Amino acid sequence: MTLNLCVLTPNRTVWDSEVKEIILSTNSGQIGVLKNHAPIATALDIGILKIRLTNQQWVTMALMGGFARIGNNEITILVNDAEKSIDIDPQEAQQTLKIAEANLNKAEGKRQTIEANLALRRARTRVETILESINRF
């Protein structure tokens, strides 16, 4: 028996297939989910989703915050945006990270600082997703 994982954004279905296990970033830390996990609904932080496929290989995905519902071996993840590591251009991600760091350094006022911090977290997560897929697998 396996888990059925569905990752949805407002615009598309990013993932919809069976998996062996996942590790995801919630607002209170990382959690691992195996088959027969206790039912839970949780808020998701900007972070990396690690997916172990039924063939034991791992895949990573950048999640940009949202919610997850787990129950009856079904995992539904609703997020603002998501990208599989293989779909992220490493050079573009690195450039976006540099721009986000520069924008944070020149941010003025509370609102600009908050927005720049959020952009930096998103950019950093995309780069870390690529690195995690390279280093782990």
From Swiss-Prot:
Instruction: Output the Gene Ontology cellular-component terms.
Output: chloroplast thylakoid membrane; proton-transporting ATP synthase complex
- Family matches, as InterPro entries: ATP_synth_F1_dsu/esu, ATP_synth_F1_dsu/esu_N, ATP_synth_F1_esu_C, ATPsynth_dsu/esu_N
Per UniProt, the keywords (alphabetical) are:
ATP synthesis, CF(1), Chloroplast, Hydrogen ion transport, Ion transport, Membrane, Plastid, Thylakoid, Transport
Organism's domain of life?
A: Eukaryota
Q: How does it sit in the membrane?
A: Peripheral membrane protein
Gene Ontology MF: a single term: proton-transporting ATP synthase activity, rotational mechanism
What Pfam family does this protein match (any one)?
Answer: ATP-synt_DE
Q: Where in the cell is it found?
A: Plastid, Chloroplast thylakoid membrane
SUPFAM superfamilies, per this entry? Answer: Epsilon subunit of F1F0-ATP synthase N-terminal domain (SSF51344)
Q: What broad class describes the main subcellular location of this protein?
A: plastid
Q: Which residues form the signal peptide?
A: none
Asked whether the keyword Membrane is assigned, the reply is yes
Q: Which protein family is named in the record?
A: Belongs to the ATPase epsilon chain family.
What's this chain's function?
A: Produces ATP from ADP in the presence of a proton gradient across the membrane.
Subunit annotation: F-type ATPases have 2 components, CF(1) - the catalytic core - and CF(0) - the membrane proton channel. CF(1) has five subunits: alpha(3), beta(3), gamma(1), delta(1), epsilon(1). CF(0) has three main subunits: a, b and c.
Protein name, UniProt field = ATP synthase epsilon chain, chloroplastic
Protein encoded by which gene: atpE
